[in-house]
């Protein structure tokens, strides 16, 4: 099983590298957009690390990754807003949803910014969760973009620091 997982990761890294080499800034945007909608498809941190290791302009990486992640997050937010509540109620129940809404109403802005900004954690669930609440879509986009920019800056910086030590990863 371990060998299968390692081969799978290597395959994703290879395709990700080729995609970013061929499409640069646009490749980063598209990969981040896709991973925000389907989080298991492409790890967002790997996209940024690959772009930095491939010498894509760091400012463009930050812009493309933040815009791609936020745009994809908006799709997830909208899908959940339009039809996710009945599905969520089946899995976690009305009482838990109400508790979550109250908690999110109190701390939601912080949750969105810090949840989207934290590197090496899945920030995409935040968009889907926010869609279950009453948060204004414009507020969500602004907060999600702020968090995505912070995350991108942190990952570009860390990737640049470790680039010399990890030439064989991607």
Predicted regions and their residues:
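Membrane-interfacial helix-loop-helix
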Residues: 1-30, 54-128, 132-170
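Short helix-coil transition sites and intra-membrane helix breaks within transmembrane domains
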Residues: 35-44, 115-123
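Hydrophobic transmembrane alpha-helices of multi-pass, membrane-embedded glycosylation machinery
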Residues: 47-51
């Amino acid at each position: 099983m371990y060998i299968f997982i390692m081969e799978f990761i290597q395959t994703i890294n290879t395709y990700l590298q080729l995609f970013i080499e061929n499409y640069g800034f646009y490749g980063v945007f598209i990969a981040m957009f896709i991973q925000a909608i389907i989080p298991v498809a492409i790890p967002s941190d790997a996209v940024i690390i690959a772009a930095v290791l491939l010498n894509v302009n760091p400012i463009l990486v930050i812009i493309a990754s933040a815009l791609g992640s936020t745009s994809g997050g908006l799709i997830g937010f909208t899908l959940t807003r339009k039809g996710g509540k009945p599905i969520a109620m089946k899995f976690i129940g009305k009482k838990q949803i109400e508790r979550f809404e109250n908690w999110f109403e109190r701390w939601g802005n912080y949750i969105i910014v810090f949840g989207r900004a934290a590197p090496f954690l899945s920030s995409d669930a935040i968009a889907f969760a926010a869609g279950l609440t009453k948060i204004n879509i414009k507020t969500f986009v602004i907060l999600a973009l702020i968090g995505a920019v912070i995350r991108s800056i942190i990952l570009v910086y860390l990737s640049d620091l470790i680039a010399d030590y990890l030439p064989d990863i991607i």
